[in-house]
Amino acid sequence: MLMDEYEENKDMCPICKTDRYLSPDVKFLVNPECYHRICESCVDRIFSLGPAQCPYKGCDKILRKNKFKTQIFDDVEVEKEVDIRKRVFNVFNKTIDDFNGDLVEYNKYLEEVEDIIYKLDHGIDVAKTEEKLRTYEELNKQLIMNNLERSRTEIESFEQRQKFEKEMKLKKRLLERQIEEEERMNKEWTKKEIVNRLSTTTQDINETIEGVKNTVKLKKSSARRKLEELNRVLKNNPYFNSNVNVQNSRLKDAVPFTPFNGDREAHPRFTLKGSVYNDPFIKDLEHRKEFIASGFNTNYAYERVLTEAFMGLGCVISEEL
């Protein structure tokens, strides 16, 4: 049964004309072979007995029922591109670590992957591109499997980290609320206690108030102790620390070679004390009008000299290369 491609109403099956307005539960499926939208009922009816030709006019693709999947995106072109990307990235799954941090080579690799995706998505040299994909998969089977396993491990680690942080934040929120409630109750107790003590003692008012406040300070709540402990746990979060270390390592590796070893230091190795230095020549310059007008400052000169003196200390060329 061949039907014209129906694009006028995205909420209607082009084969049986089932409308989502009359049948809110209608479910549309697509097959990665051609990405033509068909409702689930038509898929069951047409493809239950085995593979059959796509019912769209002009489409000669042979479809199988087990290949149909729920359409996620409204635009089938987006659906198609996402599926192609998933398939290609499952094969071309190298990361920057596989290039020893070489960003140039990694970018070339990503560009090659994007070329493959573009050709498959737009139907350019499909047979040749598919052959290239198969050849690469056969030659790099072990590397692909290793990267898939590493990716699964990273995803599991990420999920564990998310779960851990979510639980800790929830506990922290509950403890903070408990502390707020205790502080409110302590304030009420303080007011009542001050009134009670003043009515039963001849002690100075200020001393009485101070005594009550000291009593409250000594009553350190268990919730506050738990919150402090929780903050220590969050601070020493192994997931957070490992993530920061990886990022710092990558940033350090990305810094290009420099023979100076000092031009990339965030904090200088010296402390500038302008009043201590006495250079007659520089001192004379700060009193001359033309230098004052240009914004000259003696500290700039001293800072440059000290930077040049300290730059390069601790630099071992053989270790830098």
UniProtKB/Swiss-Prot annotation:
<keyword id="KW-0863">Zinc-finger</keyword>
<dbReference type="Pfam" id="PF17121">
    <property type="entry name" value="zf-C3HC4_5"/>
</dbReference>
<dbReference type="GO" id="GO:0006366">
    <property type="term" value="P:transcription by RNA polymerase II"/>
</dbReference>
<feature type="modified residue" description="Phosphothreonine">
    <location>
        <position position="258"/>
    </location>
</feature>
<dbReference type="Pfam" id="PF06391">
    <property type="entry name" value="MAT1"/>
</dbReference>
<dbReference type="InterPro" id="IPR001841">
    <property type="entry name" value="Znf_RING"/>
</dbReference>
<dbReference type="InterPro" id="IPR015877">
    <property type="entry name" value="Cdk-activating_kinase_MAT1_cen"/>
</dbReference>
<comment type="subunit">
    <text>Component of the transcription factor IIH (TFIIH) holo but not the TFIIH core complex. Component of a complex consisting of KIN28, CCL1 and TFB3; the KIN28-CCL1 dimer is known as the TFIIK complex.</text>
</comment>
<protein>
    <recommendedName>
        <fullName>RNA polymerase II transcription factor B subunit 3</fullName>
    </recommendedName>
</protein>
<dbReference type="GO" id="GO:0061575">
    <property type="term" value="F:cyclin-dependent protein serine/threonine kinase activator activity"/>
</dbReference>
<dbReference type="InterPro" id="IPR004575">
    <property type="entry name" value="MAT1/Tfb3"/>
</dbReference>
<dbReference type="GO" id="GO:0006357">
    <property type="term" value="P:regulation of transcription by RNA polymerase II"/>
</dbReference>
<keyword id="KW-0539">Nucleus</keyword>
<dbReference type="InterPro" id="IPR013083">
    <property type="entry name" value="Znf_RING/FYVE/PHD"/>
</dbReference>
<dbReference type="GO" id="GO:0006367">
    <property type="term" value="P:transcription initiation at RNA polymerase II promoter"/>
</dbReference>
<keyword id="KW-0862">Zinc</keyword>
<dbReference type="GO" id="GO:0008270">
    <property type="term" value="F:zinc ion binding"/>
</dbReference>
<dbReference type="GO" id="GO:0006289">
    <property type="term" value="P:nucleotide-excision repair"/>
</dbReference>
<dbReference type="GO" id="GO:0005675">
    <property type="term" value="C:transcription factor TFIIH holo complex"/>
</dbReference>
<dbReference type="GO" id="GO:0006281">
    <property type="term" value="P:DNA repair"/>
</dbReference>
<keyword id="KW-0479">Metal-binding</keyword>
<keyword id="KW-0805">Transcription regulation</keyword>
<keyword id="KW-0804">Transcription</keyword>
<feature type="modified residue" description="Phosphoserine">
    <location>
        <position position="157"/>
    </location>
</feature>
<feature type="zinc finger region" description="RING-type">
    <location>
        <begin position="13"/>
        <end position="60"/>
    </location>
</feature>
<keyword id="KW-0597">Phosphoprotein</keyword>
<dbReference type="InterPro" id="IPR017907">
    <property type="entry name" value="Znf_RING_CS"/>
</dbReference>
<comment type="function">
    <text>Acts as a component of the general transcription and DNA repair factor IIH (TFIIH or factor B), which is essential for both basal and activated transcription, and is involved in nucleotide excision repair (NER) of damaged DNA. TFIIH has CTD kinase and DNA-dependent ATPase activity, and is essential for polymerase II transcription in vitro.</text>
</comment>
<dbReference type="GO" id="GO:0070985">
    <property type="term" value="C:transcription factor TFIIK complex"/>
</dbReference>
